[in-house]
Each structure stands twice: as C-alpha cells, then as structure tokens.
Amino acid sequence: MATGEAIGCFGLTEADRGSDPGSMRTSAKRDGGDWGLNGSKMWITNGSASQVAVIWAQTDEGIGGFVVPTSTPGFSAPVIKHKLSLRASVTSELVMDNLRLPGDAVLPEVRGLKGPLSCLNEARFGSTWSGETRVGMPWLPH
C-alpha cells in the first residue's frame, strides 16, 4: 500500500455498533499458530476494490488489528448499493467467515482501543479538510 501498488481499506465499523471499538463483535481466536476470524464490518470505503484490509477484532488479549489479503478464503466484500450519500466511492460490507490467517498477520504491539482510535483521529483531519475545501472552493480565485 505504501508504494501505491495495492489499495487498502480500514475495517472497524460494524452494523448496529458504529465505530465503537469497545462493542465490536468481530472476533479473532488463536488456533495453534494461526488466527481464525469471524464477523462483519459495515460501510467500508473501497472494501470491494481493496487488495488488503486491516480488520479490527476482539481477541483474548483485547482488540487487535489484522492484515487480511482480500483474496483469502472466507473473506468477501459485497458492495452496498442504493446509498443515500457518499456515492463518490464504493462502499462495502466486509465478511469474515471462518477466515484463517497466519500468526504473523496481527499488527505487532497494537492492543486495545489505542490502535483503532488513533487511526480514526488521523482520518478526522482528512474529513475536516475535505469539508472545508468544498465550502471554500466557490470563493477561491480561479
């Protein structure tokens, strides 16, 4: 993703849970040296266009982030159609159904709410500037 060779998405929001990491139901369980992920994420920008997803899930040690290639068996990203807004980008549900990942797919040293909340805080800057730009554009000299 850093080189622009892959599109990624950020899987935190859940249906009926919003972006509240403390109430998420998506789970990741250790199975030997691997991880098993189950659950779903909702309203994910670029979900079906991504080659990589960062999925946040409850583990026995707290919330963890997982790097998931979207070609992994058990992963699907159905497109959400007929949205009322945010039509400039594709929005998807991310579904993990008995998805298996190697042990090193977990983001190292990221445990608890700090991981997903720090990402959300950074994203808020982009959202703010996007709105400010739209409001200010008519008054900028062309």
Predicted feature locations:
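Structural signature of FAD isoalloxazine-binding scaffolds in flavoprotein oxidoreductases
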Residues: 4, 20-24, 69, 95, ...
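A short, Trp-centered hydrophobic/proline-enriched beta-strand micro-motif
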Residues: 4-12
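Short Gly/Pro-enriched turn/cap motifs at secondary-structure boundaries
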Residues: 16-19, 43-46, 58, 83-90
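A structural signal for short hydrophobic beta-strand segments in well-ordered beta-sheet cores
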Residues: 26-28
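A short core secondary-structure module
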Residues: 40-77
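Glycine-rich beta->alpha junctions and the first turn(s) of the following alpha-helix
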Residues: 77-142
